[in-house]
Amino acid sequence: MRKHRIGIAFFYHESHSFSPMKTEIEQFRNEGYFIGDEIYDAYTGTKTEVGGFLDVLKHDEDVEIVPLLCAAAIPSGVVSTEAYSIIEKQMLESIQQAGRLDGLLLALHGAMVVEHLFDPEEHLLGKIRVLIGPNVPIATTLDMHANLSEKMIDYTPLHFGFKTYPHIDMYEQGTHAAIALLNQLKEGVTYYASFEKLPMMPPSINMRTAEGPMHKMIEWAKQAEEEAGIYNVSVFGGFPYSDIPVVGASVLVVSLDPQKGKETAQKMASLFWSVREEFIMDLPGVREGLALAMSIEDDKPVVLADISDNPLSCGSGDTTELLREMVKMNIPDTLFGGLYDPESIEACLNAGVGNKISLSLGGKVSPEFGEPVQVEATVVALSDGVFHNSGPFNQHLRVDLKGAAHIRVGKMDILLIGRPMSANDPEMFRHIGLEPATKRILGLKAKNHFRAAFEPIVGRIIYVDAPGVASNRLTTFTYHYIPKPIWPLDDIQYEVKRRGTEKWTH
């Protein structure tokens, strides 16, 4: 019996239209750029979408895995035309050179923006569909913050969104996508997609799935999946920092019964609209947040999350308002990190461990959100910045900070890192000898993903409203291309309208 040849690919970026940092090809090569068999070494045993693809396929003796191309970059500004073109060209060439493909598993983000493309994932799927033909099944995984468009569903109904934030079910959704693809390929299952796009782009700060409005939505989605004829329900919050016509929240129902799928999508969209106001949060400023942290008596550290400069929300990782106030207060047993500052790391390398040095910290990429902080520091430790995640988010994945330095300023410790990276795993600190669990206050460049690994070792978590490109106050951005009217920028009425249903036949 001829084996089913199934390709695996990954093209992942979350793009911020207002970030000062354009995303070039170097960012992809620094984060993760793997071709062919390199994909096995990079992702086997990881709790990622591609790890899920591999685990399902390698246990099916009727399948031949065809590793193609995986490219990912840390969230930042829009992807340059050159970078996108290089990766798209190489991916399409890898598909052409692979020969016969009977199916394709593709991990995407869903919130990529390119200089010349508002909807690059749809563009890529269209190019792939031309290459492999209309009858080869494709299944994708998508981030919960995807700005999903109806055009993407023209190419396949099989899109599986994450159901957790922090995203700790990437592996699970990878397995779901692979199983659905095999069902279609081997059993002839026909899937239907029912899609509802809502006129809203809620701030992502309150999209955590442990509690709040997105928790409600995911619970309703899981209940719907228990009903006959419903295969999968994805709830996408969208990415509100994308200034594009397809921005915003949506619901996608993959079903075996098109009428049931349509009814479920409409119901879920109505529920989503009904909880929209619950996504709005009022956050304390930096000084107010620090005062609150100082008032808390706890055996565990209090976290001050600098959410407006979270690198995984495309922040530069080097804004300074929270850092400046913490340095002024000089509180014992405090830790701040990771601050993106390769220049200061280089200065620490030149000075050497144990020596004192004058540094100008942060404020180099985004000085409009705070000038550099002038400090006298002691170099405590230096590192190449390489570690492996131990927490549930991207578990076991290798991380390369491109260098790191532990410095002490007064009574506080600061971790400097060589590229923007959210402080989502304690190993970022532990790999250089810092134990966050022993501190009184942690100032973290992070938003929600860090909770997966940090919640067991910390106490109170306080989000602070400091200046930054990832502010939860969407009125601070000047949009040009988003659809209007749209909530929360506009006060509008909305009712779910009946839509057509796309059908995919194999």
What are these regions (language model features)?
Residues 186-191, 196, 200-228, 246, ...:
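Flexible inter-domain linker/hinge segments
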Residues 54-75, 79-83, 87-94:
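Low-complexity, highly charged intrinsically disordered N-terminal segments
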Residues 64-66, 75, 139, 146-149, ...:
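Cap/lid and interdomain-hinge subdomains that line or gate substrate/regulatory clefts
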Residues 7, 11-14, 18-20, 28-29, ...:
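Active-site histidine-anchored catalytic micro-motif
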Residues 1-59:
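N-terminal amphipathic/basic leader segments beginning at the initiator methionine
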Residues 6, 205-411, 415-419:
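Hard-cation-handling environments
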Residues 67, 273, 386-506:
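Extended hydrophobic packing segments that form well-structured cores
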Residues 1-3, 59-62, 67, 93-102, ...:
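Glycine-rich phosphate/diphosphate-binding loops that line cofactor/substrate pockets in enzymes
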